[in-house]
Curated annotation (Swiss-Prot):
Organism: Vibrio anguillarum (Listonella anguillarum)
The protein, known as: Probable flagellin E
Coiled coil, from the record: 97-130, 300-337
Assembly behavior: Heteromer of multiple flagellin subunits including FlaA, FlaB, FlaC, FlaD and possibly FlaE.
Main function: Flagellin is the subunit protein which polymerizes to form the filaments of bacterial flagella. FlaE is not essential for flagellar synthesis and motility. May have a role in virulence unrelated to motility.
Origin superkingdom: Bacteria
Length: 377
């Protein structure tokens, strides 16, 4: 091996290894201090891209969970108010049944009507004041809203809140009253027992309800028989002996067309659309119709509560899934970006030893030019 003075190759080699060991040691110290394996793109360019995409997805999942929880809170608020609406309707139904009792005087029915009015006002107050974050929920203004419950576009669920005011069209239906008045002697005869009710539903489909009344039934028995044959209409009799029929507004897009021999005898006429806010129980006939109207309103409210309950369960399951996906993404991101302390401390000790060795060797290499002086003596 040549002995030179101008170029100390051994020292240069030792210096290079010392620099490499120092660089690797600094990298290990940075990873241990930050807790991250990737601190800049030079550490792992591909891994950094993947990690950033995973973190973006996880942030989106966090927002989606908050959105779903907001949706649940809105539905819980609305459903709680509708529970009280159901209680009010139950009480109004009780008052209607009580007013239909023949033992009540006109003054008694007027007192019951006053309570009906107060309950109706409270029902509307609940519908108008129930809100979430300043947004009205049950007065018909909420309509339909989209809740983003996913980390990407297009992962939204539509939630609609219906109008719970007592004057809502869904809170009532069409009432019909027979022009003919049946006295105590009136009976269904063999020649007058056919009653066909034709109507078109909200989807445009034609329906026919065919009733073949029992010969010998009086008007009250006829109403009971009709109620037993179909659940689409509700039949009752007023204090004048007139048959009354009621069909919920959601069942039909128009009025009922009556046909048949019994229909011709009774001469059923539509009296108009009747909702909860127009109920009058000061007469037996009105009290009887009120029961049918309130039953329709209760079915409407309960049906919407069921829809909201199903959506709440859906949102809860969505949150569970989002949490599970977030957990798996976090685990994957950790494997890519986070520091493995067991591995990195081993690497640090290794580089520290190499640094010390390289420093020692560099010191020895620097002494080699002194050999030239020994040759010159």
């Amino acid at each position: 091996m040549a002995i030179t003075v101008n170029t100390n190759v051994s020292a240069l080699i030792a210096q290079r290894h010392l620099g490499s060991a120092s660089e690797m040691l600094n990298q290990s110290l940075e990873r241990l201090a930050s807790g991250k394996r990737i601190n800049s793109a030079k550490d792992d360019a591909a891994g950094l891209q993947i990690s950033n995409r995973l973190e973006s997805q996880m942030r989106g999942l966090d927002v989606a969970v908050r959105n779903a929880n907001d949706g649940i809170s809105i539905m819980q608020t609305a459903e709680g108010a509708m529970q009280e609406t159901t209680s009010l309707l139950q009480r109004m139904r009780d008052l209607s049944l009580q007013s239909a009792n023949g033992a009540n005087s006109k003054a008694d029915r007027q007192a019951l009507q006053e309570e009906m009015g107060a309950l109706n006002d409270e029902l509307n107050r609940i519908a108008e004041t129930t809100s979430f974050g300043g947004r009205k929920l049950l007065n018909g203004s909420f309509g339909q809203s989209s809740f983003q419950i996913g980390a990407s576009s297009g992962e939204a669920v539509q939630v609609s809140l219906k109008n719970m005011r007592s004057d809502s069209l869904d809170m009532g239906g069409f009432s019909y009253v027979a022009a003919g008045m049946a006295d105590s002697q009136w009976r269904v005869t063999q020649d007058n027992r056919q009653l066909t009710m034709s109507y078109t539903d909200a989807k445009g489909k034609q329906h026919n309800i065919q009733i073949q009344a029992k010969v010998g039934d009086d008007i009250e028995e006829l109403a009971t028989y009709i109620n037993g044959q179909t659940d689409k209409v509700s039949a009752s009799v007023n204090d004048k002996g007139q048959l009354q029929l009621f069909m919920a507004g959601k069942e039909t897009s128009g009025t009922i067309d009556f046909k048949g021999s019994l229909a011709n005898q009774l001469q059923m006429n539509v009296t108009g659309y009747e909702a909860v806010d127009t109920l009058d129980i000061t007469e037996v006939g009105g009290a009887q119709r009120a029961v049918a109207v309130i039953d329709t309103a209760m079915q409407y409210v309960d049906s919407h509560r069921s829809e909201l309950g199903a959506l709440q369960n859906r949102f809860n399951h969505a949150i569970n899934n989002l949490d599970n996906v977030h957990e798996n993404l976090a685990s994957s991101n950790s494997r890519i970006k986070d520091t493995d302390y067991a591995k990195e401390t081993t690497q640090m000790v290794k580089q520290q030893i190499l640094q010390q060795v390289s420093t020692s060797i560099l010191a020895q290499a620097k002494k080699q030019p002194n050999l030239a002086l020994a040759l010159l003596r």
